[in-house]
């Protein structure tokens, strides 16, 4: 384990039948693999030393996502028993090493949020679970719409956790204007469009590179109808 700088952690992965690579974790931002050499500090930070102590020669057994949240759990089999490294990939997120009973061994930073505390020796509590669009039925959508003060596309993107691109795709499939008031739309049409989109993502996903009018590139898993004006084949 290395920390090139305070909010970046590098785990050296050595697969049995492949070349080694680095798993790079940037606090609150992203997780990716890399083969690039990085300058490392001569004196490892305390959190890096903790990771080395507990994860040295450990075997990674699983990588999991907690529900629909932007939280990854890296599971390890170590000489100390099962360990878990939780990576919170959202603004003000943390990186937390936890034992098999859920007790925090060490967080990257000690923090206190509404409803949870991240510090050594306490039970790890993930953030409150986000809405999973796969679990939203018509009744749940109706409740979300009734409480929303934003337009339809913003409500779907935020409260239903679809994000902007997928929220616009649902509006297009439902043939409803994105700026419609949620209370004025037929929930059944929105739910049918949402189910159709999620089905496409699960079963028909292909890679597309979509160019906007200024030439910027955005990778997407399916070809959305509201973006087809920019498709080049």
Predicted regions and their residues:
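Extended, highly charged segments
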Residues: 1-228
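A short, hydrophobic C-terminal helix/tail in secreted or cell-surface proteins
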Residues: 229-233
